[in-house]
């Protein structure tokens, strides 16, 4: 990703405008440097570069920033910055409207299931977030029926998988009771096993979304 300035929803509109322009200036410099380095690396694997669109909750700033990034020779776009949950789908739509169809749209920092659906419906292609691993460390387990805390008392003697029907490594080999025990003891294996399940959940979710679109 090209260098950008991540603002917060607490920054003023005036600051957000300055930030959009600053990010655009940095983006142009990044493209120039990327082209120079690509020429130097002739014959080596190509390294893609994405530009990042900022603008907080302001539709006009998001559209302006998207048009600016679209005007540069990026391989794709990153939809970044702080966004209120209620307009996350709208924000994706504002930005994707300005993007060429052949450029991938990556939404940064999204891991809520409903947010993923909102973004996909409005043009988002790929996603990243630390939440599956961060939540796993605290005992939060994602399932098709919602998220639950494995460290609650009812799971202490539950010898079933973290999620019925899940074919991840953790669910095929370990029980809720065992993962609960490891997390309570703060054993690193507990963090790892819970993370494996959560990451598998999101990979499978996106696989199913992709299959639904292709179908």
Predicted feature residues:
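Active-site beta->alpha loop and helix N-cap motifs at the rims of alpha/beta catalytic domains
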Residues: 1-37, 49, 53-60
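Short, small-residue-rich loop/turn micro-motifs
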Residues: 4, 73, 183
């Amino acid at each position: 990703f090209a260098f950008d300035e991540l603002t917060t929803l607490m920054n003023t509109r005036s600051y957000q405008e300055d930030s959009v322009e600053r990010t655009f200036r940095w983006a142009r410099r990044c493209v120039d440097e990327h082209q120079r380095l690509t020429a130097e690396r002739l014959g080596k694997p190509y390294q893609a570069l994405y530009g990042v669109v900022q603008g907080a909750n302001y539709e006009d700033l998001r559209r302006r920033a998207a048009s600016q990034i679209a005007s540069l020779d990026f391989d794709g776009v990153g939809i970044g910055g702080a966004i209120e949950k209620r307009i996350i789908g709208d924000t994706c739509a504002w930005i994707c409207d300005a993007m060429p169809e052949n450029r991938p749209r990556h939404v940064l920092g999204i891991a809520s299931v409903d947010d993923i659906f909102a973004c996909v419906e409005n043009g988002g292609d790929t996603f990243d977030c630390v939440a599956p691993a961060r939540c796993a460390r605290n005992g939060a387990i994602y399932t098709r029926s919602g998220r639950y805390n494995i460290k609650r008392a009812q799971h202490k003697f539950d010898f079933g998988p973290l999620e019925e029907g899940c074919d991840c490594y953790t669910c095929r080999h370990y029980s809720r009771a065992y993962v609960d025990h490891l997390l309570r003891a703060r054993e690193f294996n507990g963090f790892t096993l819970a993370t494996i399940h959560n990451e598998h959940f999101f990979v499978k979710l996106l696989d199913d979304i992709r299959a639904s679109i292709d179908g």
